[in-house]
């Protein structure tokens, strides 16, 4: 822990108000909670103008000061005019930490968190407006950031390849909380959602890079016909889930976004967690499933493999046959499933939010020394 007097940090939290906050908001909130629990920081959140606080579970654990512009206008002003300063909302600060994509103007040292560069990997999945916004942000990442915190080695490599100075990049992996739920509570939750049969689970925003067509086609070909597929996550874009699952009838359940406690119970109750994503900056759901003691099947060649280590069955996410074979292996072997459960819990235990916060503090200390 760095030894300072109290340091005031402006910490952007606008993603908590997004229609689909997702993993980036969860990471920002978890780190904020850990940093706030210490005594060395006066951490103050920054957001655009909103009439209401974000909905649970996205309520920040720190006070949030709002600037006088709605989100889109604020981002345009930040990127094109380099104003307004966050200090207009927060007062004087010693450091600014931008936890989302947008880059605020700064007279204090600026830390950025970058989770992924998905739009560079598959720009066709983004609108022209979205690509323009990300290109503006990337230009400012290169020119304005004093340090850039990357959630995986894969993201760090992508940042370097995109022209961010290597000397400014720091690896700061995300964390995961241990999931321990009583069997009775799991059973109650499953019953409430009408999940009466064994099931394969996938969790994540329903968007193209999650590779749902491959997952659904692979599931349709598994050997066991007494197993269902459960999809959990907010609706994203360009994915017609209902059309994909219609041929499988009631063997596929699409539950949408769930409260954290219910989601964790489904992790714990699943036979296997399958996450054949085409691209991830970290792959937090993989570690969440492992923390719940659930066997994992996930993708080679993405940051999910980096997160999973040797504790998952890894597949080519573009191969329906490989995904089907992996599901059959885990569903057909109690010994393999138990081995993956134990290995997964051990792997997840290596990723702690307290460590993420400590590494974040070290980055702050570099700039404030």
Where are these regions (language model features)?
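Carbohydrate transferase catalytic cores enriched for Leloir-type hexosyltransferases
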Residues: 1-369
């Amino acid at each position: 822990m760095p030894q300072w007097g109290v340091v005031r940090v402006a910490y952007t939290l606008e993603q908590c108000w997004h229609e689909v906050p997702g993993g980036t908001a969860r990471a920002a909130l978890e780190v904020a909670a850990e940093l706030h629990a210490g005594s060395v920081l006066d951490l103050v959140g920054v957001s655009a103008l909103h009439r209401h606080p974000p909905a649970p579970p996205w309520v920040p654990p720190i006070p949030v000061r709002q600037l006088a512009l709605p989100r889109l206008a604020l981002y345009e002003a930040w990127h094109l005019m380099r104003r307004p300063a966050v200090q207009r909302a927060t007062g004087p600060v010693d450091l600014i930490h931008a936890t989302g994509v947008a880059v605020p103007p700064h007279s204090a040292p600026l830390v950025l968190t970058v989770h992924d560069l998905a739009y560079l990997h598959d720009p066709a999945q983004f609108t022209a407006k979205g690509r323009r916004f990300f290109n503006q942000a990337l230009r400012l990442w290169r020119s304005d950031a004093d340090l850039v915190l990357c959630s995986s080695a894969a993201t760090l490599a992508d940042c370097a390849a995109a022209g961010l100075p290597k000397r400014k990049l720091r690896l700061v992996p995300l964390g995961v909380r241990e999931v321990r739920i009583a069997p009775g509570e799991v059973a109650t939750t499953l019953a409430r959602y009408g999940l009466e049969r064994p099931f394969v689970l996938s969790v994540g925003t329903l968007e193209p890079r999650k590779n749902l067509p491959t997952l659904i086609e692979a599931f349709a070909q598994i050997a066991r016909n007494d197993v269902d597929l459960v999809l959990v996550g907010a609706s994203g874009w360009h994915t017609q889930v209902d059309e994909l699952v219609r041929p499988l009838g009631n063997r596929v359940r699409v539950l949408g976004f769930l409260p954290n406690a219910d989601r964790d119970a489904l992790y714990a109750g699943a036979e296997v967690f399958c996450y054949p994503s085409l691209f991830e900056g970290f792959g937090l759901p993989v570690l969440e499933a492992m923390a719940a003691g659930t066997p994992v099947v996930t993708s080679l060649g993405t940051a999910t493999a980096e997160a999973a280590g040797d504790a998952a069955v890894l597949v080519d996410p573009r191969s329906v046959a490989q995904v089907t074979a992996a599901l059959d292996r885990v569903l057909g072997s109690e010994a393999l499933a138990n081995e993956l459960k134990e290995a997964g819990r051990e792997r997840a235990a290596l990723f702690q939010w307290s460590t993420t916060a400590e590494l974040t503090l070290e980055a702050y200390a570099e700039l404030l020394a």
